[in-house]
Amino acid sequence: MTVLKMTDLDLQGKRVLIREDLNVPVKDGVVASDARILAALPTIKLALEKGAAVMVCSHLGRPTEGEFSAENSLKPVADYLSKALGRDVPLVADYLDGVSVQAGELVLFENVRFNKGEKKNADELAQKYAALCDVFVMDAFGTAHRAEGSTHGVAKFAKVAAAGPLLAAELDALGKALKAPAKPMAAIVAGSKVSTKLDVLNSLSSVCDQLIVGGGIANTFLAAAGHPVGKSLYEPDLVDTAKAIAAKVSVPLPVDVVVAKEFAETAEATVKAIADVAADDMILDIGPQTAANFAELLKSSKTILWNGPVGVFEFDQFGNGTKVLAKAIADSAAFSIAGGGDTLAAIDKYGVSKEISYISTGGGAFLEFVEGKVLPAVAILEERAKA
């Protein structure tokens, strides 16, 4: 994958527009989770150190295009950046017809989704973005799977279009895990439905040695193997699909599970052997023996890809499976990469972020890359690098 990298460019005195993913949760006008901002800070600091006039843009939420809405304003992000960098970071609302920024200065543009034509990737808007800068830097891996004005269109028209350090690191880590992984490789794919992760499961079945499934996905595989799943969430119409995947790659199944009679925070958890699951049971986690078996598989792996918690870890009585696997990944010497919103929440809960080799900032983009799909914002950077 050949793209021009921001780190290789001379940015002294250049006007640099950086597209970051600053789509963070905001509560009562204050940033509630700063993970994405923290991930973007090194790129912004580097551009300033290189003597650039820095303009940063991002989306936040899903406002009605062409209309300002206070709840989707990036004002809380500008406030956060000002504190984090110890300098004034002005939020600029009207920037499409030009903005004054000097070398060593930093401004944040208001939500790009307030601009008409952003989501449709309109050329007219993309050309206005491009006219603002000497160098466009795409650093938002989380939106790289969307062809929009500020992620794809601008890269077509900017004088120079490059990948930022965060985007480059994501691509390197994912390439390492998927293109030529150190073997044996284990993947953990969990979620409520096989249908939403079908492409991921198919793609991984051809590169990994062990495909560990969890959540509703595991229930469909259990049903495919003839095991009782009670009233658990599963997809009867995808049982044959599960059988086909299990014929291609080793899919270790739970030998014991944690069940309850209802899906609730107060539900009583009971450990049962898989054969003993009753008709009115709901499977809400893997059992302790299964967790130990899976942890053993992870211990002998050289590459681990993790997408999705294996139980309803938000309720502590159904969190042990995810906790044991999180610790096993943390203790492993393997190259490990984790991605997806729920996965990141589990990593936070069990305090293993420092032990995982690479944590992806992109949810949908992470999955699409794993599926083997082309990410439009990356493809345009490759095209520009060739030219």
UniProtKB/Swiss-Prot annotation:
Coiled coil: none annotated. GO terms for molecular function: ADP binding; ATP binding; phosphoglycerate kinase activity. Keywords: ATP-binding, Cytoplasm, Glycolysis, Kinase, Nucleotide-binding, Transferase. ATP binds at K197, E314, G340, G341, D342, T343. It catalyses: (2R)-3-phosphoglycerate + ATP = (2R)-3-phospho-glyceroyl phosphate + ADP. Its EC number is 2.7.2.3. One of its GO terms (cellular component) is cytosol. Pfam families: PGK. Pathway: Carbohydrate degradation; glycolysis; pyruvate from D-glyceraldehyde 3-phosphate: step 2/5. The keyword Kinase applies. Its main location: cytoplasm. It is found in: Cytoplasm. Substrate binds at D21, L22, N23, R36, H59, L60, G61, R62, R113, R146. InterPro entries: Phosphoglycerate_kinase, Phosphoglycerate_kinase_CS, Phosphoglycerate_kinase_N, Phosphoglycerate_kinase_sf. One of its GO terms (biological process) is gluconeogenesis. HAMAP family: Phosphoglyc_kinase. Monomer. Belongs to the phosphoglycerate kinase family. This is Phosphoglycerate kinase. It comes from Pseudomonas putida (strain GB-1). The lineage of its organism: Bacteria, Pseudomonadati, Pseudomonadota, Gammaproteobacteria, Pseudomonadales.
